[in-house]
Amino acid sequence: MDRRILWINVVLAVMILVAFLMPRRATAIPAFSREHGLNCNDCHVAFPLLNEFGMEFKQRGFRLPAQEGKYPWELSSLPVSAIGTMQYLNAHQHDPVTKARLSTTSEAEIEEVELMAAGTAAPKVGFLAEFAQEVADGGPFSTEQVWMQFSDIMPASVLNLRAGKMLNEHYHLSQKRRLTFQQYLAPVTFNVTGAELNGFWSGIRYAAGIVNDEREEGTNTAAVNLNTKLQGFYTWGSYTLWDHIIGVRYINTKANSDHPSPIIDGRTRQQLDATLNLRFNRGQVLLGYYHNWDIGGVYKQDRRNYLVEGMLEVIPEKLFLDARYEMQDTGTVAGSPNNPATANGTLVTGHISYYVVQNVRVVAEFTKVRGEGLDVLAIGEPNGVASSNQERYLLGIHFAF
């Protein structure tokens, strides 16, 4: 076993042990802090990771308990926030067989900037508009999310209706609200467009949505009928018991085939996942299992992702540690372009966050990827290509105001 991976596993085990032993303390986007007089830690375990109160605040359509919300002209401040990440990285790529170093990258960069407006547009009507640019990759300034939620169709947010471009994810395990700069390899979060019914009641949080499928224009555009895209649906639920959360989710959608012919217009892709968030004292443990089948339009081809993550609050509201291990395992189907020779890999990340103030943190992080290719997370890019071993050392700043 690689000594770095062994070290990460030891750190994760220690974090889990300490999390059981340390006393628990009960723990916002800056725009919400200004409007409601809240501290960031009222909604976040550590920015951007939500606590239980933050999850309920979001699912209520950005309303506090027993409040209906206001019109924009009644607000005491503009509901707008800016969020950004800057980083210095030193990355290396090695031959998976000889271990010889193939390349080295060393640079400072602005990774991403976001503008976000969120709050209530009227009593019981919440909204979120998020726009972002991946500056380091030269990406465009684009729309991440734009949705409205009509809350309290059944009282106390037992049932809400949300529509627009939004995220299909669990609130306790989110690509957008992770501590690490390194993204999750597992299919944790999907950006979808459509309508969703959601709510929470007596420790149960739930949602079901009908959304556009995952098909996109391909090489043979004429063979892809994108006039009937509203063919995806999903449902998820989670239950909180003794401060721990268990979640399940099912996704059924259409996706483009990886074969150029004869299947162009996509086949059904399905996903079933289960997650467990164990929250002890000042620590958390996240476990995830993700099963995809009929991936890439290939009948019966499946892929499994496994995720283990531990987080520890070493100094209250100041110093946090995070360690994560992920593995991707793809089944074999004769003639498929997605077989294990091109679709397996592992990812290990070790992370330290120090909060200078509640909305500004300094980050140090190490990530190692071992992959054989397709859909293995290349460092810095979700669902990219990792054709060899890669490792990255990173120093960064994450801020919101």
Please report, for each region that a protein language model flagged, where it lies by residue.
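C-terminal segment of classical bacterial N-terminal signal peptides
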Residues: I16-R25
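Sequence/structural segment immediately N-terminal to covalent heme-attachment motifs in c-type
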Residues: I29-N39
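Outer-membrane beta-barrel pore domains
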Residues: R101-S103, V146-F150, M154, T240-F401
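Bacterial N-terminal signal peptides that target proteins for export
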Residues: M1-V11
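The canonical Cys-X-X-Cys-His
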Residues: G37-F47
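Outer membrane beta-barrel
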Residues: N51-E52, P79-N90, L102-E216, K229-F233, ...
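Short cysteine/histidine-rich metal-coordination sites, predominantly Zn2+-binding motifs
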Residues: F53-Q67
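Short Fe-S-cluster ligation motifs
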Residues: A66-T85
